[in-house]
Amino acid sequence: MNSQELKKRQENIRNFSIIAHIDHGKSTLADRILEKTETVSSREMQAQLLDSMDLERERGITIKLNAIELNYKAKNGQDYIFHLIDTPGHVDFTYEVSRSLAACEGAVLVVDAAQGIEAQTLANVYLALDNDLEILPVINKIDLPAADPERVRQEIEDVIGLDASEAVLASAKSGIGIEDILEQIVEKVPAPSGDVDQPLQALIFDSVYDAYRGVILQVRVVNGMVKPGDTIQMMSNGKTFDVTEVGIFTPKAIGRDFLATGDVGYIAASIKTVADTRVGDTVTLATNPAAEPLHGYKQMNPMVFAGIYPIESNKYNDLREALEKLQLNDASLQFEPETSQALGFGFRCGFLGLLHMDVIQERLEREFNIDLIMTAPSVVYHVNITDGDMLEVSNPSEFPDPTKVDSIEEPYVKAQIMVPQEFVGAVMELAQRKRGDFVTMDYIDDNRVNVIYHIPLAEIVFDFFDKLKSSTRGYASFDYEIAEYRRSQLVKMDILLNGDKVDALSFIVHRAFAYERGKLIVEKLKKIIPRQQFEVPIQAAIGQKIVARSDIKALRKNVLAKCYGGDVSRKRKLLEKQKAGKKRMKAIGSVEVPQEAFLSVLSMDDESKK
C-alpha cells in the first residue's frame, strides 16, 4: 500500500475500549460485539471469550487487558477496522485500565440500568477523561425487572457530567442495541491521529512470553509503520532486534504484512530475555529512529508487600523464573530476594492491592505448579530515625531498634464508598473501627450515598473489603487512591516461640490495639501449633516488653505405668528423670511452625476489634 492508501485506511480505524464497574456486563457486551461483527464464528463463541485465563472465567472478573481487531460494515456503506481493547474493572487492576486507555481514542462506558453508577465506574471515567477520550454512555441490562434507564440517564448527567441524552439503551445478554453502539463508535470516536510517513513510534502496552518465539510485544502504532524484516530498537535501552512477524489478534494471533499508524497488534522479534522489554516503552526503527519516545505510563508503585516462599526450598529458582515471566505480563508486580530464618529463601513481592496479591499467588500455583507460603501483607512505612534519616520499610523484620525511632508515618488512602442510605451507619461504624477519618458525604439520589473517608492503608489490606461487603449485604462499591502519609503511634510486635523470635510472624500494629492483637494471636497460635515433647511458651513482645503469653503443654508418656504399687520415692525418681529429659529437650528442641500459623495472622485482624 502506498502512503495515500494507508492514510485513507487510517481514517476508517476506530480504537476504543469498554469501561465499567465489575459485573455491569462489560465482557458480555464484548462477546456480542464479536458476534455482531462476525469476528468469531458461532461455533467458537463461548461466554467471556476475551477472558482467556482460567482464573478470570472462574471468578467472573477480567484481570488482563486484551486487544482485538474487528471488521464492521457501517450503514453508510464503508468498511471500518475496529480495535476493541478489553479492560478490567477491579480497583487493583486500574493500571491495566490506564494502559488500555492510552491505546484508544474512545471509550464505551457501560452502566447497569438497575444499579446505576458505582465507585469504579467513576474511577475509570476519570481515567478516560485524563486521556482525552470520547466517552459513549451505554445503559445496559434494560431487560431486568428492576431496570430504571431514565434514573440512570439522570445519574450519568448529574454525577459524571456527561450528556446522556443519546445514551444507547442496550441489553448485552439479549443482543438489544448492539448495532446502535457500533454506529455510535463510527460517528463519534475520532480516527487515530498520527502520520504514517513519520519515523516509527509504537507504544508497548503489554507483552507475553512464548517458549518458541521469545517475548511477543503488543503495541499500538502511533506514527510510521513496521513490517517483518525491519530492525526495531527499544527507546529506553537502545537494544535492537530483527522483526520476524507482525500481526493482529482476532482473538487468535494472525500474521500480517505490516502494522501502520493507528493499528493495534503484535510484534515478534526473537527477544529472548524478559528484561529487554518494558511495558510503556516506545519501539522505533533502528535505521530511522524517532527523535523522542512517546509519553509512556506513570510507573505504578506497589502498595502492599508480602513475602512469598516455596514450600520446597529446591524450587527457589523455579519461583524466580515464574515471577520474571509474570512480571513481563504484569508490569506492576515487583519482587526482590529475601531470606527468613523461619522460611528460608524467598522473595519480597510488591502488589497493587489484595486481589492482585491473591491472583498472583493463584497464577504461581496453577500455571507454574509451585506450592507457596505467603507471609502477612504489610505496607510501606516511613520511619524517621533520631539522627534525622528517613527509612522506607515494607518488611516488619527490617524495622530499626525502637529506641532509635523518632516517629513513624503510614500511608492513608482516600476511600470512596457508594452505598444505599440504609447501610450508611454500618459503613461509618466500620470505617471508625478501622481508624478512619470522616471527610464528606454526598447524596447521589434519594437512596444512594457517596461517603468519603481517609483510612490507613494497613487497615484496608487486611479484610476491609470483605467486612464492607458483609456489613452492607454486598451493596456497597468501593474505590481508593493513596492520599498522604501521616504520623501514627505504631509499634512492631514480635512473636516468640520457645524464646526465639519467628521473623515471619512479626507485624506492625497501632499502639492502642497492641495488647488485644498480641493476646489474640498468642491464643490462636496455641490452637494451631502441635504439642511438642516439651512445654512451649508463645509470647508477644514489643521490644523487650512481653505483652501476652500462652503455653502449649508438653505431651508426656506415663512413666509410672510399670510401677504396680511400690515405693513413692521410686515413682518420684522416674518423674524427676522425665522432667530433666524434657528440660534438656526444651533447651535444644526447635518448634515446627505450620503454614496455617502464618495465615492466622491475616485472618485474626478484626476479631480483636469487635
Curated annotation (Swiss-Prot):
It catalyses: GTP + H2O = GDP + phosphate + H(+). Required for accurate and efficient protein synthesis under certain stress conditions. May act as a fidelity factor of the translation reaction, by catalyzing a one-codon backward translocation of tRNAs on improperly translocated ribosomes. Back-translocation proceeds from a post-translocation (POST) complex to a pre-translocation (PRE) complex, thus giving elongation factor G a second chance to translocate the tRNAs correctly. Binds to ribosomes in a GTP-dependent manner. GO terms for biological process: positive regulation of translation. GO terms for molecular function: GTP binding; GTPase activity; ribosome binding; translation elongation factor activity. The keyword Glycosyltransferase does not apply. Residues 11-193 form the tr-type G domain. GTP binds at D23, H24, G25, K26, S27, T28, N140, K141, I142, D143. It comes from Streptococcus equi subsp. equi (strain 4047). This is Elongation factor 4. It is a peripheral membrane protein. HAMAP family: LepA (MF_00071). NCBIfam families: lepA, small_GTP. Pfam families: EFG_C, EFG_III, GTP_EFTU, GTP_EFTU_D2, LepA_C. PROSITE patterns: G_TR_1, G_TR_2. It is an enzyme of class 3 (hydrolase). Keywords: Cell membrane, GTP-binding, Hydrolase, Membrane, Nucleotide-binding, Protein biosynthesis. The keyword DNA repair does not apply. SUPFAM superfamilies: EF-G C-terminal domain-like (SSF54980), P-loop containing nucleoside triphosphate hydrolases (SSF52540), Translation proteins (SSF50447).
